UniProtKB/Swiss-Prot annotation:
The gene is rrp41. Coiled coil: none annotated. It is an enzyme of class 3 (hydrolase). This is Exosome complex component Rrp41. It comes from the Archaea.
Length: 243
């Protein structure tokens, strides 16, 4: 969240944003499940201009052995941005942001998984950001959840994800990169729609209590929209688009 001055009109007098969307409109979301042959499960997502690939391995033996948990399986997650994912070449080594997002996604996914059915094993989630455009952690979380379902990992529900934020003193859905850099607040949310449970909520910026409530409600509404795309991706994968 930058809060920087910008010459771009983020929100015009008709309530239209800089990319032509309305206040409560998400960017285009497309998800394809089962795109990798060598992973146990996989998914590819385009969320606006974000392009992200998620691959799953496991349940499998845990290495190193000291990480084994006798009563349950463990989830490990690596979120990585390719050097060409942003306009200025990114160094290949993991950044503090990548390490933080890896941890955030892991903790957002864990409540959805029945890891207790696979004690002494690990499920590994690998996320590769091919192109980033604001909201990549939400896009990555949504793709990872579809990939876990594609891998056949028992789940209580899928985790959907979307962000809302404050731009030009207005609460808007699904903040893009330009809005993120110049906006006032950004709130990514992870949500399990069938269970009506939030698994992730973060806030970068400052909101009043009323703005916070409206922002969270709008983000959850966005999650529900993304959830429909997630379900369609799995339906297309296993039933050829049938119900």
């Amino acid at each position: 969240m930058g809060g920087r001055d910008t010459d771009v009109v983020l929100l015009d007098e008709n309530g239209i944003r800089c990319d032509g969307r309305k206040i409560s409109e998400t960017r285009r979301v497309e998800i394809t499940a089962g795109v990798l042959n060598n992973a146990n499960g996989s998914a590819y997502i385009e969320f606006g201009d974000n392009k992200i690939l998620a691959g799953i391995f496991g349940p499998r033996d845990v290495h190193p052995k000291h990480m084994v948990r006798t009563e349950t399986g463990i989830l490990r997650c690596r979120y990585h941005m390719s050097p060409f994912s942003v306009s200025e070449r990114k160094k290949p080594a993991p950044s503090r942001r990548e390490i933080e997002i890896s941890k955030v996604i892991k903790e957002a996914l864990e409540p959805s998984l029945m890891l207790e059915q696979f004690p002494r094993t690990a499920v590994d989630v690998f996320i590769e950001v091919l192109q980033a455009d604001g909201g990549s952690r939400c896009a990555a979380l949504a793709a990872a959840s579809v990939a876990l379902a594609d891998a056949g990992i028992p789940m209580r529900d899928m985790v959907s994800a979307c962000a809302a934020g404050k731009v030009a003193d207005t609460i808007v859905l699904d903040v893009n990169n330009e809005e993120d850099q110049a906006g006032q607040a950004d709130m990514p949310v992870g949500y399990m729609p069938n269970l009506d449970q939030v698994t992730l909520i973060q806030l970068d910026g400052v909101l009043t209590p009323d703005e916070y409530s409206r922002c969270a409600a709008m983000a959850i509404d966005g999650c529900k929209q993304v959830y429909e795309v997630q379900k369609k991706a799995l339906s297309d994968r296993f039933f050829g688009g049938g119900e």
